[in-house]
Amino acid sequence: MAAKSDGAAASAGPDPEGAAGGARGSAGGRGEAAAAAGPPGVVGAGGPGPRYELRDCCWVLCALLVFFSDGATDLWLAASYYLQNQHTYFSLTLLFVLLPSLVVQLLSFRWFVYDYSEPAGSPGPAVSTKDSVAGGAAISTKDSAGAFRTKEGSPEPGPQPAPSSASAYRRRCCRLCIWLLQTLVHLLQLGQVWRYLRALYLGLQSRWRGERLRRHFYWQMLFESADVSMLRLLETFLRSAPQLVLQLSLLVHRGGAPDLLPALSTSASLVSLAWTLASYQKVLRDSRDDKRPLSYKGAVAQVLWHLFSIAARGLAFALFASVYKLYFGICIVGHWSVMTFWVIQGETDFCMSKGEEIIYNMVVGIIYIFCWFNVKEGRSRRRMTLYHCIVLLENAALTGFWYSSRNFSTDFYSLIMVCVVASSFALGIFFMCVYYCLLHPNGPMLGPQAPGCIFRKASEPCGPPADAITSPPRSLPRTTGAERDGASAGERAGTPTPPVFQVRPGLPPTPVARTLRTEGPVIRIDLPRKKYPAWDAHFIDRRLRKTILALEYSSPATPRLQYRSVGTSQELLEYETTV
């Protein structure tokens, strides 16, 4: 039985041979457990599972502190401009606070409506599941609120008490209260705060509950953390980044000693940008069992890397904008257009539809105005080097144009600003090298990334065996009658002739003692798994998420996810082409 979820079918069946779900360790130090990845496309959910730790709780509390400090300083600064009768600065500051917040709250409330709404007559995504234990009962469900049935469609054995009118009334009252609370929270622009607190609550519940409920709460915590990290990433680059450039340009234009309140607002915006980027990368790696999780030391190194890089970038923008306002806008639009086109050319695969993918690429283009953001799997060394060279040239050009128009009575002040831009960019590159050389989850990334034919340490040849056919023949020449007669004579004479078709040799089968798996069903998703650094489909597709949570909560054992493997289809296609 198949289930559609935005074009994807999800089903759960017997555990395939070799499809073992690897367990991950604790939230803070799960690198060793995640290293032993299973077959491609299998998302492990069995075993002891991860464990929520105290430092995870502290990380969420620090994220809340950064969120409140950024918003409070911006509103305080806007009120200060209003009291000083600086209505232009007041309007711009308030616009950069309210407009991104409204966009993010609408998106967050839209997600809430979909997650908590019950379908009315429309068939939801159907999922069928069969236990991996021999003879286990098959279960199927429609959407997260559907009832589970046996394979024949009859209700599961056992008493099925009908809900009383009192319980149904209490349930409706609870749902009404939740809707009213969420509406009030989002009207107060506190949707992200609610999601942070809910992620904290779910993480603590996963630590205190039993094994089965612990895994369920941990999955919910990962889903909530993914949502709030994506919302924060969108909001910070729509709010904090323009706010940073605006306040820095005002400070440079005024000159002299900076005021306390604009300096606090600028610092809070800068920390918010750096923290959001590091938090996004950490949650993304924690959500994928095929990648090693990011340690907190690596996350702090990323915060420092982005902090100094964005500071240099923002200060260069502010210096140039304080003198050439019109040309600054042209430079920003031009850089965004080039970066967006570059991202689109890379053919990213983050969203479930083409329209959402284009919007995502446009947002990534905004991020590329200020800092590096990896959107494509593979060795990103060349792309990262090219990007930082472009940023270095732009920073030098923007600062140079500002320095050429300086006032000669403030040469020392101008020289200090140039040195701050250069040293901040250098510190950002330094912490980036520290992260990639010492704290990257996969080990040092700036040395030789993998042994191969070029390096002497390779224990095996890189090429395929001599007797293996790696590509199909381009054409088969037509044989003539003389060749056929010669071939027949050769066969009669006993001379060996080469075979027409050759089968590529495979690995010899090794006898493995197979045991029945008892850890639960496997939820099969009829989609190829998205490559890192993209989110998995069950984090993006909310219907698929609801179905997985329903199966995970109702199953006596923790199910595992298996995406469609593209290896088998590629092998079949290559075989058909060869024949």
Swiss-Prot record:
The chain crosses the membrane at residues 59-79, 89-109, 260-280, 314-334, 355-375, 384-404, 415-435. Residues 1-18 have a biased composition (Low complexity). GO terms for biological process: apoptotic process involved in development; engulfment of apoptotic cell; phosphatidylserine exposure on apoptotic cell surface. It is found in: Cell membrane. InterPro entries: XK-rel, XK-related_scramblase. GO terms for cellular component: plasma membrane. Keywords: Cell membrane, Membrane, Transmembrane, Transmembrane helix. Residues 1-40, 146-165, 466-510 are annotated as: Disordered. It is a multi-pass membrane protein. Its main location: membrane. Signal peptide: none annotated. Residues 19-31 have a biased composition (Gly residues). PANTHER family: XK-RELATED PROTEIN, XK-RELATED PROTEIN 7. Belongs to the XK family. This is XK-related protein 7. The lineage of its organism: Eukaryota, Metazoa, Chordata, Craniata, Vertebrata.
